[in-house]
Amino acid sequence: MLEELGVVLSLSPEQNERVLAETGICFLFAQGYHKSMKNVAPVRKGMGERTIFNVLGPLSNPARATMQLLGVYDESLVMPMAQVLSNLGVTRGMVVCGSGMDEASLIGRNKVCEIRDGKLTPYELDPTGYGLSLCTVDELRGGSPKANAQITRDILAGREQGAKREEILLNAGIALYLGLDGLTLADGIKKAAELIDSGAALAKLDRFAAATQEAAKA
């Protein structure tokens, strides 16, 4: 999907560093940083099911970010992953499982564990408590990479006002809540809506894509 949006994924660490400095965003393709991931990729693809690498991948972030929002596919992983992130130096973060999805979800309640300076706080997050509506899996379903790229652009351009937009508001709102001092989660969701409605989010996406293209040519 990112490639359909114009993002170049196969950048070197030095190229990604320039993109990050310019835009505040970069995509770190695991196989480019952890050679073992490249070796096992064909096996993982052939198996067609989750493996230990679905758990290890998010924990091997080469950026060593101290703030992270991490989704897991099973509720039983929420607390262990939060503990590992804290042990790895994450001082502000959240691990979330949304009704079997590895992200915050509008399908139902979300089991989360918030990380703040070594303290782990588990709780359930109900989207309806933040003005968001519950939905079905079908309402969130995407399609091909090309179709998903168009859905993304429609949301960021304000043409999509349904469940998919609210799913983005929830997840982006959590990230803003974690990353900006003094915000409540409700503030984060409101801020996410403002950034989309103002066109700032779409402009950032376009600038990010352009920056990766420029870096690839340099």
What are these regions (language model features)?
Residues 3-10, 15-218:
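Glycine-rich anion-binding loops and their surrounding alpha/beta cores
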